[in-house]
Amino acid sequence: VNHNYICKYNIGSFASNLKYAEDARDLQDNWMSLFDVNLVSINEQFNPLISMDMVWANNLTTHWDINRRRDVSLSLVNAQLSETSGNEIVLGLGYRFGNLPIFLKSKQLNNDINVQFDFSIRKNNTIIRRITENVDQLTAGEKVMSIKVSADYTFNNRLNLRLFYDRKVDTPYLSLSYPTTNTNFGLSIRYTLMQ
């Protein structure tokens, strides 16, 4: 079981307020601040909010993750709040086939093949909130579905062979951008020169 939380608070830019005086007020009878701040942002992530990895006695592995993210930026120049949020769920399943024989010429190798399948759904959206006008507007967003399948075979401690297939389907919430699909597949051979 795993959990991680990260939060960052940033002040984009600030300058000394030349009109500042102790106990001074502005025209709306608000206290005057020592600094003029233009932008404040908060970035928080639960990456993962909760995650669980399990290895079963029959060489089966399962895992699932729930991730959350939120970025909030307050612009004090134009009184706008920009909020970007994202939610993701990842489900994974793997299996290790032990001592699988592979014949190369007159030599037989008995190594393991690790097969991994991951499926994820991520939803992102960006909302602009105009505070003085009391208007909220969705300006960006998407739903991303991803499938990743791979099989790894280790010939020895230096040589590894990997077959993979990745597919990502991106469906936007707004009609300003087009749905896209990306597919990657292939074979990779990794040879390690150093130990």
Name each model feature, range by range:
Residues 2-195:
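Exposed, low-structure sequence patches enriched in small/polar residues
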